[in-house]
Amino acid sequence: MKIDVSRLSAAVNDAHARHAQAPGGANASYIPYLAKVPSHLAGVAAVTVDGDQVVAGDADYAFAIESISKVCSLVQALEDHGPDAVREKIGADPTGLPFNSVMALALHDGKPLSPLVNAGAIATVSFLKAANAEERWKKILAMQSALAGADIALSDEVNQSEQTTNFHNRAIAWLLYSASTMYSDPMEACEVYTRQCSTLFTARHLATMAATLAAKGRNPLTGKQVLKPEHVPSVLAEMMMEGLYERSGDWAYMVGLPGKSGVGGGIMAVVPGVMGLAAFSPPLDPAGNSVRGQLMVADVARTLGLNLFDRA
């Protein structure tokens, strides 16, 4: 399936025009940095597997990646250990509960189930092949940059805001440790996980990351093979099951694309073999997904007939 660039451009611009001022939602308030991001911002981007780029609105505004970073640490874990080990040690099942749920751990004897919820992501960071925190962090940051096709940087302001409010995640890390599902020092893993959520991305960067996954692990802008092609299906399966937390089922039902959201207002979706889509707008629904971002990405997907469950 190949999409004409002029048709893609029309779909992206129309989606932005229709939904950039959609009502509803509110900025994440529990992280001080996120609470003060201008809520009117809205951008959408598409990057094809051939490297074509189409953007509209605030697609180049830099925002905190937050939970979308979980995809990057999952990719690194797959590269370090392979899909079987990741499935055994972390899991490959949706929790059906909020992304920071402690109950999910209690219900499953301390196993985090999915690398795309907080418990699983912290465990994933601990599972990476690394001798210490800095080595762990450098691998994750390098992976973020390779997937985005850009020099991704840590925001000290976001990191400070997160590190001083991550009490819940610290508790999760100790619960994992008590259940023997933590594979490094728990506070080291939690600190590095918090850092990985504090880097700055744009919607264009997210669309490039999604396009890299759409292109079987090859970044269409840099030409670099970022991850092994055989690891991509594992990433997309996790995104389809848990990428939008307890709204993942609704997203699959309505949009039919593997996606991942973050409380910074970003969202991305992968159209295998075709393109990556992404959007950014800070106001969130109760599950922590961008209200306008979902609308914009869903609009483009619907206009172009991209639903994976509705393709001949």
From Swiss-Prot:
Substrate binds at S67, N118, E162, N169, Y193, Y245, V263. GO terms for molecular function: glutaminase activity. GO terms for biological process: glutamate biosynthetic process; glutamine catabolic process. Its EC number is 3.5.1.2. It catalyses: L-glutamine + H2O = L-glutamate + NH4(+). Pfam families: Glutaminase. InterPro entries: Beta-lactam/transpept-like (IPR012338), Glutaminase (IPR015868). Keywords: Hydrolase. Belongs to the glutaminase family. Homotetramer. This is Glutaminase.
